Amino acid sequence: MDGIKYAVFTEKSIRLLGNNQYTSNVESGSTRTEIKHWIELFFGVKVVAMNSHRLPGKGRRMGPIMRHTMHYRRMIITLQPGYSIPPLIEKRT
């Protein structure tokens, strides 16, 4: 299982960081239990709650044919007070 695809940085997700809530896109086939276990194991934190929603795919025109991109799942992960996840941003030099 690949788990988390990447962290999401939107206006809403940055606002939620103040509430100790982290937003990320995850594999669409994974369950909440798998993601919770993976986050607690990998980052060493305690997850209090998880909210998820599935975002629809967008339409893409490929010549005369209209196709759709794959949908994906976004999770909002709430941690216990005192725990935090380090930033998932790589520095470019």
Swiss-Prot record:
Q: Which GO MF terms are attached to this record?
A: rRNA binding; structural constituent of ribosome
- Main localization (coarse): plastid
Chain coiled-coil ranges = none
Q: Which terms under GO biological process does the entry name?
A: translation
Q: Which InterPro entries match?
A: Nucleotide-bd_a/b_plait_sf, Ribosomal_uL23-like, Ribosomal_uL23/eL15/eS24_sf, Ribosomal_uL23_CS
UniProt keyword annotations, A-Z: Chloroplast, Plastid, Ribonucleoprotein, Ribosomal protein, RNA-binding, rRNA-binding
Query: What is this protein's function per UniProt?
Result: Binds to 23S rRNA.
Oligomer status and interactors:
Part of the 50S ribosomal subunit.
**Protein's name according to its UniProt entry:** Large ribosomal subunit protein uL23cz/uL23cy
Native source organism of the sequence = Nymphaea alba
The encoding gene is rpl23-A
